[in-house]
């Protein structure tokens, strides 16, 4: 089952999640919404293995990058009954 990777606007552009990902799912893209002028993006979610190393590496109090595994994807989107 596919995993979804969500990057929130609390991202500070530190690149920790990008460096932690063993599957190269994440990359940094230009964004003017933070001091670093870049934000994490997840263009290759089909390669995500669900290890959540990106979450562990995130230094923000509110995890800026979240991985939702299988059924969690459905629940997080409010689609579960």
From Swiss-Prot:
Q: What are the recorded GO MF terms, alphabetically?
A: 4 iron, 4 sulfur cluster binding; electron transfer activity; metal ion binding; oxidoreductase activity
Report what the protein is called.
Photosystem I iron-sulfur center
Q: Which Gene3D superfamilies match?
A: 3.30.70.20
User: What's the chief localization of this chain?
Assistant: plastid
User: GO biological process: what's one of them?
Assistant: photosynthetic electron transport in photosystem I
Q: Where does [4Fe-4S] cluster 2 bind?
A: 21, 48, 51, 54
Task: Report the residue ranges that make up the 4Fe-4S ferredoxin-type domain in this protein.
Answer: 2-31, 39-68
For the protein in the UniProt heading, the enzyme class is: oxidoreductase
Q: Which reaction does it catalyse?
A: reduced [plastocyanin] + hnu + oxidized [2Fe-2S]-[ferredoxin] = oxidized [plastocyanin] + reduced [2Fe-2S]-[ferredoxin]
| UniProt-annotated location(s) | Plastid, Chloroplast thylakoid membrane
Q: How does the protein's chain sit in the membrane according to the entry?
A: Peripheral membrane protein
Residues the entry annotates as binding [4Fe-4S] cluster 1:
11, 14, 17, 58
Q: What is the lineage of its organism?
A: Eukaryota, Rhodophyta, Bangiophyceae, Bangiales, Bangiaceae
- Tell me if Translocase is a UniProt keyword of this record: no
Q: What is its EC number?
A: 1.97.1.12
Please list the cofactors this protein needs.
Answer: [4Fe-4S] cluster
Q: Which UniProt keywords apply?
A: 4Fe-4S, Chloroplast, Electron transport, Iron, Iron-sulfur, Membrane, Metal-binding, Oxidoreductase, Photosynthesis, Photosystem I, Plastid, Repeat, Thylakoid, Transport
What's this chain's function?
A: Apoprotein for the two 4Fe-4S centers FA and FB of photosystem I (PSI); essential for photochemical activity. FB is the terminal electron acceptor of PSI, donating electrons to ferredoxin. The C-terminus interacts with PsaA/B/D and helps assemble the protein into the PSI complex. Required for binding of PsaD and PsaE to PSI. PSI is a plastocyanin/cytochrome c6-ferredoxin oxidoreductase, converting photonic excitation into a charge separation, which transfers an electron from the donor P700 chlorophyll pair to the spectroscopically characterized acceptors A0, A1, FX, FA and FB in turn.
């Amino acid at each position: 089952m596919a995993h979804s990777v969500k990057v929130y606007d609390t991202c500070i552009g530190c690149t920790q999640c990008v460096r932690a990902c063993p599957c190269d799912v994440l990359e940094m893209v230009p964004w003017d919404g933070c001091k670093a002028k870049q934000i994490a993006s997840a263009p290759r979610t089909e390669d995500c293995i669900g290890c959540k190393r990106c979450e562990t590496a995130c230094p923000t109090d509110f995890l800026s990058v979240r991985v939702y595994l299988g059924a969690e994807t459905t629940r997080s989107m409010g689609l579960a009954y």
